[in-house]
């Protein structure tokens, strides 16, 4: 028969006595406090981090973090040949510039549709001697000097596209606006200058880059490959841009036979002659002549647009279609 000893009974009574309950409460409280010390600290830390006020009152910590950030920036600067001279400037070592030229050149040849390749090649070939020559050209001209002084930035906002759309149909502004709409581009798509060291040179190259679409517009050349090559040749002969000269020489090599024939017989001869006869386009303050009559501007610049490339291509496509229909009819 099962029996309970007096000691077991007494232990059971003691376990449920008020004194022992009090002891258990103290023990559990101590465990909870210790757990809160270990775990609760992490919870409070996470809450403070989430609220963004973790170290708001700890000036020493903020100072240390700022110091570490500055050290990282200094370490990055120490890997560059010089300090950045303007916002967005990335100084390059000579071998990095050579690599940029080689890689961007190959990419531009095989993938001319990628604008980033063209942008990088342009800056890699923008030698200081060329930019200094362009600077002298601007300094010798009254308008060029004002452009260097004002440092204008061509954007949709600065040009006020809505105002351009309401200008006289034969004005420079409306001609530019109509060309942008026809080609589906915007002045805001021009990339900033990154790899040119001198701030003045960087501005000059940015100005050339931002004015590129005006050269298209006044000559009514589309942004298809033939139109781009023609404008590059025009730029090369007018202001001597090295990348433009390279593009005009090498880009036609990958074109179809009929495209080459058009370029070599019509557009490249026009581009060289027009560029040499035209006044330096880098000295044109486009923002100030938007109201001017486009024909009057062309006379002042001494430039005549080439034959309509879109029309020639369209007629060529029509002839091919007619020939194809005749051939199919003959086969039947």
UniProtKB/Swiss-Prot annotation:
Stored InterPro entries: Coq4 (IPR007715), Coq4_euk (IPR027540)
Q: Which top EC class is given?
A: lyase
The annotated topology with respect to the bilayer is: Peripheral membrane protein
Please list the cofactors this protein needs. Zn(2+)
The family database entries (Pfam families) matched by this protein are listed as: Coq4
Compartments, as annotated in UniProt = Mitochondrion inner membrane
What span is annotated as transit peptide?
Answer: 1-16
The positions annotated for binding Zn(2+) are 212-213, 216, 228
Q: In which pathway does it act?
A: Cofactor biosynthesis; ubiquinone biosynthesis
Q: Which GO terms describe its cellular component?
A: extrinsic component of mitochondrial inner membrane
Name the principal localization, coarsely classed.
mitochondrion
State the family it belongs to: Belongs to the COQ4 family.
In Swiss-Prot or TrEMBL terms, this protein is called Ubiquinone biosynthesis protein COQ4, mitochondrial
Please state the gene responsible for encoding this protein. COQ4
């Amino acid at each position: 028969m099962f029996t309970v000893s007096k000691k077991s009974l007494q232990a059971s009574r003691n376990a449920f006595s008020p004194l022992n309950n009090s002891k258990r409460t103290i023990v559990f409280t101590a465990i909870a406090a210790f757990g809160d010390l270990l775990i609760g600290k992490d919870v409070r830390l996470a809450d403070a981090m989430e609220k963004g006020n973790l170290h708001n009152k700890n000036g020493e910590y903020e100072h240390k973090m700022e110091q570490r950030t500055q050290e990282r920036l200094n370490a990055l600067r120490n890997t560059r040949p010089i300090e950045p001279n303007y916002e967005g400037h990335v100084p390059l070592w000579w071998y990095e510039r050579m690599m940029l030229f080689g890689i961007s050149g190959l990419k531009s040849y095989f993938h001319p549709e990628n604008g980033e390749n063209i942008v990088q090649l342009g800056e890699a070939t923008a030698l200081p001697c060329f930019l200094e020559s362009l600077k002298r050209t601007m300094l010798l001209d009254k308008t060029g000097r004002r452009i260097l002084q004002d440092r204008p930035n061509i954007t949709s906002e600065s040009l006020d596209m809505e105002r351009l759309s309401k200008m006289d149909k034969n004005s420079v502004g409306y001609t530019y606006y109509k060309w942008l709409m026809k080609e589906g581009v915007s002045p805001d798509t021009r990339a900033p200058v990154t790899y040119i060291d001198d701030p003045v040179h960087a501005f000059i190259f940015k100005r050339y880059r931002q004015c590129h679409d005006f050269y298209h517009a006044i000559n009514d050349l589309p942004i298809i490959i033939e139109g781009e090559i023609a404008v590059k040749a025009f730029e090369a002969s007018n202001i001597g841009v090295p990348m433009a000269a390279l593009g005009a020489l090498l880009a036609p090599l990958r074109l179809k036979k009929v495209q080459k024939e058009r370029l070599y017989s019509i557009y490249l001869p026009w581009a060289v002659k027009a560029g040499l006869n035209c006044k330096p386009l880098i000295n044109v303050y486009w923002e100030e002549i938007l109201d001017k009559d486009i024909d009057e501007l062309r006379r002042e610049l001494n430039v005549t647009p080439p034959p309509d490339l879109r029309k020639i291509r369209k007629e060529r496509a029509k002839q091919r279609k007619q020939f194809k229909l005749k051939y199919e009819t003959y086969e039947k």
